[in-house]
């Protein structure tokens, strides 16, 4: 029996939910696995879900894949998959050392490969593509250079990526400018031009999405309060939505 305080404080998200759904499928004898997006490319967070392993339903739509940008989608497997082989004293994020992550991005979304040539690629053992999530750059794909070129296959489109590598001190360092992979498969580097500046005014800091309208309606008639003391005594209403 679970103690009542533990039940009150229990929080669940897509990870335990996906595991519960996975157990149901396996109890029914359905071959299944957990697929996941480690990091979204256009919002904070990630998503995990259980899926049946059947080529006839690989195109089944996952809600979060349809409304958010997925740079990579992986599957947890029993069999080993290729992993990065670190050199002496080379730092590689643990995710890319885990042999039970399989790239299944192309089962869900259109993808393209990214080919990069840049000075210094020859001097790194592994390169990564990172996306911005939760206030920092998160590595999402790993590849090994061949000469002065490095190739990243099966990348999600309409996404900004930053090519990086790691120092022996675990520091992330860009080895090329950030780039955009467009929907037609073309790659465009983003290079700042300090001689041609422009004025930009941001009216919001988070994308406005239609699926959020339901939540927005809950704020109607809400109001903001302010007080001139740390204890927030005798607050005054300053704005009503």
Give the residues covered by each predicted segment:
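Structured interaction patches on ligand/partner-binding surfaces of diverse proteins
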Residues: 167-195
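Short, acidic Ser/Thr/Gly-rich low-complexity loop/linker segments typical of extracellular
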Residues: 135-148
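Beta-sandwich interaction modules
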Residues: 239-241
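A short, amphipathic beta-strand motif
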Residues: 112-121, 203-210
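Hydrophobic/aromatic-rich core segments of domains that either
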Residues: 1-4, 9-97, 101-106
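Short, ordered, surface-exposed loop/turn motifs in non-cytosolic proteins
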Residues: 120-136, 214-226, 231-235
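Residues that flank catalytic or metal-binding motifs in active/ligand-binding sites
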Residues: 28, 46-48, 112, 125, ...
């Amino acid at each position: 029996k679970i103690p009542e305080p533990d039940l009150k404080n229990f929080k669940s998200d897509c990870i335990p939910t996906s595991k519960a759904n996975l157990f149901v499928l396996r109890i029914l004898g359905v071959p299944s696995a957990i697929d996941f997006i480690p990091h979204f490319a256009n919002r904070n967070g990630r998503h995990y879900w259980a899926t049946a392993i059947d080529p006839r339903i690989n195109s089944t739509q996952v809600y979060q894949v349809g409304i958010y940008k997925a740079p990579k989608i992986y599957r947890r497997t029993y069999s080993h998959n290729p992993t990065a082989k670190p050199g002496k004293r080379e730092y590689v994020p643990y995710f890319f050392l885990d042999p039970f992550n399989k790239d299944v991005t192309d089962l869900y979304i259109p993808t393209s490969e990214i080919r990069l040539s840049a000075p210094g690629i020859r001097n790194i053992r592994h390169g990564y593509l990172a996306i911005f999530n939760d206030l920092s750059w998160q590595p999402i794909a790993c590849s090994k250079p061949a000469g002065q070129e490095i190739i990243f296959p099966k990348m999600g489109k309409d996404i900004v990526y930053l090519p990086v590598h790691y120092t022996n001190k675990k520091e992330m360092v860009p080895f090329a400018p950030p780039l955009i992979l467009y929907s037609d498969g073309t790659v465009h580097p983003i290079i700042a031009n300090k001689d041609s500046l422009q004025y930009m005014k941001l009216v919001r800091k988070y994308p406005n999405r239609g699926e959020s309208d339901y939540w927005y309606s809950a704020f109607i008639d809400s109001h903001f309060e302010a007080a001139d003391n740390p204890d927030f005594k005798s607050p005054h209403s300053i704005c009503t939505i």
